[in-house]
Amino acid sequence: MDPPLKDGVIMRQHRISIFKKRRRSMKDIKILGVDIAKDVFQLCGIDEWGKVIYTRRVKRAQYVSTVASLKVGCVVMEACGGANHWYRTFMGMGIPTQLISPQHVKPYVKSNKNDRNDAQAIAEAASRASMRFVQGKTVEQQDVQALLKIRDRLVKSRTALINEIRGLLQEYGLTMARGAKRFYEELPLILASEAVGLTPRMKRVLNCLYTELLNRDEAIGDYEEELKAVAKANEDCQRVQSIPGVGYLTALSVYASVGDIHQFHRSRQLSAFIGLVPRQHSSGNKEVLLGISKRGNVMLRTLLIHGARALLRHVKNKTDKKSLWLKALIERRGMNRACVALANKNAPIIWALLTRQETYRCGA
């Protein structure tokens, strides 16, 4: 029987085993899943067999230096707030980095939800060969996306303000014609009239709201001028704008949300990315197609459909092949479905123009 080891020898062997395990962890990390937050980041590294070999919780100030000290095959984070900044940071350092959609991570979260389990789920999801990743954005793309979102918020708040003024006037028995154009024509007349039954206090309130509305219009105009200048200076936006029914807002939304067009190997993939293809609920030999999936960027899909709707208003007297197809589609399926069909037709055209670096050529 071997003599018992002394406590000092046992502690020394334990420290050696921990050191060897730590060295192995730093060398063999294939995927480093990171659950990012504002101040604290949870790291989870797995090897080529999917086994967890490294876990650590670090502060924001230590995050970059900690990842840089590890020899990792790939850093993976959820595509959430701040992810694009870290994506650009690590890619600039030469560290392969991927972003993954949170909806693809959720099925891999085991037991309770916490930062440790989330980081492990991110690493495990990223290890799947069929996993789909999110394209990281450049600084320019984020600038354009910010401008588009701010403009969209201002437009929605302007609509809400117009409806608020209409509702207030209706309580005093005053109704206005439908449409923003008629609203801007009639409101100054109402405020200037003495025979409409409004109290002086209410007139002051409505004048303040009207001033706020005009300021909102001015802000929207400033952002639109900025967006037009960006679209004019971007060659890809000019190519996309050459398509009938596609304006500068749609072209910029494509630039900001799609990113590298070469991530899509077929034109159909871009339509699916935008959410313009039917949802499928099939089983066995029975194929069931439902309405459009509505996945992806809501703003881009909305702009494509609204652009298609604007184009359909002018096909009535046209006799070219595309216009005849659209008129037949409107008669058979209605205006709304025709708008979606045209938007779904424009998405592959956008893919073709950007991949081939060409301008739209109208067919006979």
Swiss-Prot record:
Function recorded in the entry: Required for the transposition of the insertion element.
Protein name, entry field: Transposase for insertion sequence element IS1111A
Keyword annotations from UniProtKB, A to Z: DNA recombination, DNA-binding, Transposable element, Transposition
Protein species of origin: Coxiella burnetii (strain RSA 493 / Nine Mile phase I)
Family: Belongs to the transposase IS1111A/IS1328/IS1533 family.
Biological process, per Gene Ontology: DNA transposition
Domain of life per record: Bacteria
Any GO molecular function: DNA binding
